[in-house]
């Protein structure tokens, strides 16, 4: 398979008429959204009208809870933990994903990372054949995790993730360096180790180096195309191969545990 060639998404719908739901997890600034964007690009969906898209991408970041005045005051000082499971509106995430699986059009909140609040406008997402959902805790809640037919974990080293986060938060979110580093040490790193990293075991595919791993991403894209063509069943996706290592053996405890650790 050509490493960088774009491929057109097959016009066939999944066998059961429902979208193929893919969860993408990994630490902060690991490259989750870049991996999703690369998949969308390789499936030839970048320039497609939103009414006709067969692949859509959602971010867990859109579903941060509405903060109380006290929480918002802490957030503006960098003293609120946005990496904790309770920071997300998991009920709304679950409702949204279920509606997408039912072929419904949904409205996605738009979050303002500068003011730490939801904007008045929402993003309309139309039914699609493939739905990519990315987030640091995409696999944490079992009821959400069990909805994914494919689970990807973007595995990027801590130094790279920290440097990316510093640049992003300073350039895009108006933070200063001291605040970014304090928040990382106080909340981000401990939360990654406690809540995100343990969910890596649920991944069907682990992607070292994120979007730079062209081989792994091309394999994933081919796999998605096979599914859209009806070549593989949902059950067969559980044996899919890690980007560089051997296929995982899945144990009953993988799906029965309500918490990842």
UniProtKB/Swiss-Prot annotation:
Q: Give me the disulphide-bonded residues.
A: none
Annotated substrate binding sites: 83, 111, 116, 165, 175, 183
Please state the pathway this protein functions in, per its UniProt record: Pyrimidine metabolism; CTP biosynthesis via salvage pathway; CTP from cytidine: step 1/3; Pyrimidine metabolism; UMP biosynthesis via salvage pathway; UMP from uridine: step 1/1
Class of the enzyme per the UniProt entry, highest EC level: transferase
Record's keyword annotation contains Kinase:
yes
* Keywords linked to the UniProt accession: ATP-binding, Kinase, Nucleotide-binding, Transferase
Q: Where is the composition biased (Polar residues)?
A: 238-247
- Show the segment(s) annotated as Disordered: 1-24, 238-261
Q: Which GO terms describe its biological process?
A: CTP salvage; UMP salvage
The UniProt similarity line reads:
Belongs to the uridine kinase family.
Q: What is the name attached to this protein's record?
A: Uridine-cytidine kinase 2
- Gene name as annotated: uck2
């Amino acid at each position: 398979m050509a490493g960088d060639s774009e491929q057109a998404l097959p016009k066939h719908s999944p066998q059961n008429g429902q979208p193929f739901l893919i969860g993408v997890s990994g630490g902060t600034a690991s490259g989750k959204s870049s991996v999703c964007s690369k998949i969308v690009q390789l499936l030839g969906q970048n320039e497609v009208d939103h009414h006709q898209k067969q692949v859509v991408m959602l971010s867990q970041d859109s579903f941060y809870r509405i903060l109380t005045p006290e929480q918002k005051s802490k957030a503006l000082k960098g003293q609120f933990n946005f990496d904790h499971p309770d920071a997300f509106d998991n009920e709304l995430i679950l409702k949204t994903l279920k509606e997408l699986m039912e072929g419904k059009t949904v409205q996605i909140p738009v979050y303002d990372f500068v003011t730490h609040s939801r904007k008045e406008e929402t993003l309309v997402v139309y039914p699609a054949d493939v739905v990519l959902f990315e987030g640091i805790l995409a696999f944490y809640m079992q009821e959400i995790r069990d909805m994914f037919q494919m689970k990807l974990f973007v595995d990027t080293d801590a130094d790279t993730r920290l440097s990316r986060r510093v640049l992003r938060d300073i350039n895009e979110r108006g933070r200063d360096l001291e605040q970014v580093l304090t928040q990382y040490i106080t909340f981000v790193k401990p939360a990654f180790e406690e809540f995100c990293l343990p969910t890596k075991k649920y991944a069907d595919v682990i992607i070292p180096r994120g979007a730079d791993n062209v081989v792994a991403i091309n394999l994933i894209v081919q796999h998605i195309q096979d599914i859209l063509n009806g070549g593989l069943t949902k059950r067969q996706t559980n044996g899919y191969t890690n980007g560089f290592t051997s296929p995982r053996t899945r144990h009953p405890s993988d799906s029965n545990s309500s918490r990842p650790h």
